């Protein structure tokens, strides 16, 4: 978290609710699925795709209408298709909140129209958006400026896609009770920032300023080139290179450097497989933020049958044999 203000205040979040709706539909439905528009769509208020009960529309088209046009009718159609009813779908939304560890978010419907007890916090809405943005199809939809479906062209309500060069998503929201809500995401120089404001009448300007500040004052440290060497006993090589399984990344303020620490054994025994996990690499920012990745063997080291075993190797083998014997004995009991 780079900046926060009243991040845990529970508030209505209007159509940004549809971030969760789209995420669940993408998990449960195929894009090519055909949805028969249910009669419930005729009674939905607010922004609309203009769907007609009884017509058939693919899930993919409904998702674009949901996230670009903010169609409340699309939200209902998708909810009924995915779960059988709006109520059942809302229950799935709340189950997903629990799975994400969210304790101050509750949904009563899939579109975000005002409902008693429905809402979230800026912090938890950011968690939902971050989770949704992990889905490639979701990212593609929310980054789309306009989409023509059935002869109608829908323009994304997210103005930042046109006004902020690095914007890549995600969703606007508004009701009289909730005010203006905006969840935005922008990417620059390998760094992706997510911004959430609730009940902010100056959201476009505030998001532009916050994103500019975030990119100017922070950088993404990438731990490329980190490498360790461990002694190897009983191998055809006397040492093996150990590298991060994936390049570790940590967001830092400009001018900061991370603490780099590795949890590794003092030596290892052959045989070793390429990619075998040998330890953990941890990057720690000055504020205590951490990220960890596995450290793995960069190349395989086969066992050398011609080498005599050293005392530590004999001891290690005896220990392993004793462990297997103990396991076998316990298993027989």
Feature names for model-found ranges:
Residues 102-106, 114-333:
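Domain-terminus/edge residues, biased toward the C-terminal soluble/receptor-binding domains
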Residues 1-123, 127-136:
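Active-site-adjacent loops and short helices of periplasmic peptidoglycan-processing enzymes
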């Amino acid at each position: 978290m780079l900046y926060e203000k009243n991040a845990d205040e529970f508030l209505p979040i209007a159509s940004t609710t549809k971030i969760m709706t789209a995420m669940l539909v993408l998990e449960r439905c195929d894009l090519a699925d055909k949805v028969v528009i249910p009669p419930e769509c005729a009674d939905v208020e607010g922004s609309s795709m203009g769907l007609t009960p009884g017509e058939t529309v693919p899930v993919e088209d409904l998702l674009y209408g949901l996230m670009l046009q903010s169609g409340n009718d699309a939200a209902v159609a998708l909810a009924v298709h995915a779960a059988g009813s709006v109520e059942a779908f809302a229950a799935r939304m709340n189950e997903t909140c629990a799975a994400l560890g969210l304790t101050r978010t509750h949904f009563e419907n899939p579109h975000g129209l005002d409902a008693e007890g429905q809402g979230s916090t800026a912090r938890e809405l950011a968690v939902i958006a971050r989770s949704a943005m992990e889905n490639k199809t979701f990212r593609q939809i929310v980054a789309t400026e306009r989409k023509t479906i059935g002869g109608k062209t829908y323009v994304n309500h997210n103005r930042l896609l046109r006004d902020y060069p690095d914007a890549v998503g995600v969703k606007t929201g508004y009701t009289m009770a909730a005010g203006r809500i905006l969840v935005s995401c922008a990417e620059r120089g390998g760094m992706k920032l997510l911004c959430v404001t609730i009940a902010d009448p100056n959201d476009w300007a505030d998001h532009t300023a916050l994103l500019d500040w975030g990119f100017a004052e922070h950088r993404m440290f990438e731990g490329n080139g980190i490498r360790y060497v461990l002694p190897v006993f009983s191998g055809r090589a006397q040492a093996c290179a150990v590298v991060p399984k994936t390049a570790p990344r940590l967001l830092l303020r400009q001018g900061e450097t991370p603490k780099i620490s590795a949890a590794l054994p003092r030596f290892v025994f052959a045989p070793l497989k390429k990619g075998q996990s040998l330890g953990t690499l941890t990057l720690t920012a000055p504020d205590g933020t951490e990220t960890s990745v596995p450290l793995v063997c960069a190349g395989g080291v086969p066992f050398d049958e011609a080498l005599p075993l050293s005392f530590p190797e004999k001891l290690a083998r005896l220990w392993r044999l004793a462990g297997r014997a103990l396991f076998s004995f316990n298993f027989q009991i």
